[in-house]
């Protein structure tokens, strides 16, 4: 009995490139079957390219692994630009066999995808540390130094202690081998994982501040200077989580 096109499409979802059944379907003259095969082949190419890109984002870590450094921590921060809320940093040590292909710079991902990947990273990572510096401290030491403090705090939370650090556009005062990478969150899976942990952690915190301080839209803008946020400042004033040294807040105090 000839299999239905609908059933073949269903089977293709779980078919590997080496499956002998593919040879049988390739002989099927029905247009629907051939179109389904073309779609499957296109998806396989995309998956292969995705895996290749993912593996290339372990190139820097792999260089360290080959030198005997097993515990490599990726470090990244989020929240330098907002007018309100803390700067949050994360440090993540991934295992050599980490296989979550979608991990990349958090800015390239939807909020839903970041939440999904956050859970997978939490599950699979060897260790995760999160550092946080509040707005009042940012005002005292400046945002650049605050980001460094948050990153250092995140690294110091890691257990086991990392043997080397891969850091996105920053150097830390830590006695560990470290590599400074421009756009590191798109070049290293470890930094990409850290960027996701930091971003989701901060977004969830800002959502809670949206409930505590209504009228600014923190749950939507994460403290950035959107129209709603700026109008809230004009109507209500500033909150304890606003950064008083950031324009336009400093201009109205």
Curated annotation (Swiss-Prot):
SUPFAM superfamilies: Ribonuclease H-like (SSF53098)
Protein name, as recorded: Ribonuclease HII
Organism name: Leuconostoc mesenteroides subsp. mesenteroides (strain ATCC 8293 / DSM 20343 / BCRC 11652 / CCM 1803 / JCM 6124 / NCDO 523 / NBRC 100496 / NCIMB 8023 / NCTC 12954 / NRRL B-1118 / 37Y)
Record's function text: Endonuclease that specifically degrades the RNA of RNA-DNA hybrids.
A UniProt-annotated Pfam family: RNase_HII
Entry-linked InterPro entries: RNase_HII, RNase_HII/HIII, RNase_HII/HIII_dom, RNaseH-like_sf, RNaseH_sf
Catalytic activity from the UniProt record: Endonucleolytic cleavage to 5'-phosphomonoester
Domain RNase H type-2: 70-253
